[in-house]
């Protein structure tokens, strides 16, 4: 949950190098991130703002209801020698004359948006002198999720994420050989997801994953998204993906984290060149 504006550089430790420093937790490698620190010079203030849109890059193409019925008829002919659906039902599904009785639904399109907006704003203040250098970064990132909403419902159950970051680094030279470093960083994360979920400790999943899974499983002719009289269809064997996305309430979570690092570095090169001793408290 770092903001990109906080990152100065990063490096990767692998194999024995990682395990020597971080033990078994570093067995798969460790990414070390160096955050931005103050540079000597006049105060520099930089403001950035980005706004864009996100969209799925690749989605599967599903057959429509009429084609599904024709394919099922072919399969039924092999197994029982009979058609599962009449030609009149297939024609009615293709023509869409009575969507309540002969639905033809692309469930993936019914529960997802074509694109969603996202935005990022940051404030970067950097500067300092030989004695004191400082860096302050404030950042905000927000994005809306891909699940649809129902305007007739009082609440908005679609995915949403908002994150606020703060990072400040101070470097102070008490003496020509003594340096104090203070780093403070954290974030507040607010995330909202649809309330429908089948997640468990043994099989953890996100609500979005569950809803997309429903959209993949449901047949295009099981029932319409919503009946023309406004009632929501229900089926004992197939959950309505649209209802799961829009009428199952929502889950809102707040996560906050604050990290601090205090270090004192003493240059004792006059006693043993070159050598520096550092005391770090995290």
Spell out what each predicted region is.
Residues 280-282:
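Conserved small/polar residues in nucleotide/adenosyl-binding loops
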Residues 257-259:
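Short, solvent-exposed loop/turn segments enriched in Ser/Thr/Gly
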Residues 1-5, 11, 17-254, 263, ...:
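Membrane-proximal, glycine/serine-rich, low-complexity loop/turn segments characteristic
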Residues 271-274:
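Short helix-terminating capping/connector loops at secondary-structure junctions
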